[in-house]
């Protein structure tokens, strides 16, 4: 009789559904944890680190995850890490946060503003700032980790929390995959990531069911001329003049070769050439960023840039052995595009948990890019959702006085955006790993 009762109890227990985490419970738990998260955010903001130099950030993240019961693997692509929490059978999920700062001198006015100086990979000492919100991303990841660790009766499966280096250089995700990330943790069933966005009101959640960000490629053109005296230009080939002609000709690719209905961008961000006013140098360099919303346009732009550079030099009489050298960085990244079905599931979960008014419609106002696709575009691709969290008080948006990303003036409403980010990401995780 006792055996029968025990078996019946076990069967009944196994068949009971996992009770969902009520919205009020989650928001109250995040509120109770915010003092800790605020201290972490201030620490990360005041101590930014350049790409692939995120040693202290990575170690602090690892320590926080280990304290919550996560198994942490360090040193994936130098400073990358992954913290794993297993909770029975079920799907596996990657949640990624990027960690690096930018070579920007902070002028935000925050009492915990960065005064950090770091030597970059060229050996130059630079000011460093979290001018894109990656401090918020790491803090949010830690907040999500606590909610998952404290509510293991509400989900099942495996969660891998990834601290990724070098997003700003568009090589960190690719480097982690190349360094064996998925050999270490296995191929996940889903992947999620978020980004705080200054153009949206703080606390709002924005989820696209398709395109999120453009592709990005970096191109360097080395224009080679023939050096001569500045008073005798006819005896040489002036790479500065040829470079200037190339700069202008590149703009015609976008305006005259690509459909006006297709977004495309070629920006020459740097032009270096010459050493003195009376010297015509033997070379000049152009550094270019290239953006597109489709792979077809992306490849067309890259091919067209090389064609324009070479043919412009030929038209100037440059010999075949001195034609421009066009280098395309291997750290380019494709478009960030959400899985439509997964995005709808995440949107529904966020709407149900945070209210319909928490969601805003996605729109594209610029051609920003991300390297998250390099984390998920393996063979076969991992279904993924990348969503945005508003970061600026509405009154600052209305007055136009907010600091844009990568600006010395950049700052967010950290409390509102972190709480919203933790709640939305936890709800998304419960949706993908929960059981009805």
Predicted regions and their residues:
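Soluble non-cytosolic domains of exported or imported proteins
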Residues: 31-35, 48-59, 131, 135, ...
